[in-house]
Amino acid sequence: MKYQKLENQEANWKWIYLIRKHREGENITRYEERSLQEAKAQELLESQNYPEKIEEWIKNHLSPALPIKLDQAIRARRKRFFNGEKQHTKKKSIDLEYAVWLRLSKYSRKMKMTLSETITYMIDERESKAQFENQMAAMKTSLKNLLK
């Protein structure tokens, strides 16, 4: 396993996920009767700060349609949590206009690079071009002074 499991943290993530699903109107329990669904959801709601109770509730009352979705959500959350700890793995987002993103995407495919690598490459190229222009300007000035 790439990422360490944190039992208490993951129980809290599961609680958040299930309560959000419940508030969106989805049945998170294995029961068909509406009053029983509400009672079990309320029981889960009250067990927020008790990881053992959350895990027990999931084992006993979770809808058969949810375990895979729940596991996927927790796995993704765990990955984001651990990647967010280190600066070099932490993901950042930027807003791009669609046309800009499209051009960048095409250029990335052409260069066989990721978007991040392409942006880094373009910045490096621009910096080296600026450095070259400064050197050329300095040489021109030196030549003019020499020819006077």
Swiss-Prot record:
Subunit composition and interactions: Homodimer.
The organism's place on the tree of life at top rank: Bacteria
Gene Ontology biological process: cell division; regulation of DNA-templated transcription
Keyword Cytoplasm belongs to the record: yes
GO CC annotation terms, alphabetical: cytoplasm
Function description: Required for spatial organization of the terminus region of the chromosome (Ter macrodomain) during the cell cycle. Prevents early segregation of duplicated Ter macrodomains during cell division. Binds specifically to matS, which is a 13 bp signature motif repeated within the Ter macrodomain.
Keywords of this entry: Cell cycle, Cell division, Cytoplasm, DNA-binding
Protein name, UniProt field: Macrodomain Ter protein
Similarity-based family: Belongs to the MatP family.
Chief subcellular location: cytoplasm
Coiled-coil region list: none
Pfam short name (any one): MatP
GO MF annotation list: sequence-specific DNA binding
Disulfide-linked positions: none
Cell compartment(s), UniProt: Cytoplasm
Gene3D superfamilies named in the record: MatP, N-terminal domain (1.20.1270.380), Met repressor-like (1.10.1220.10)
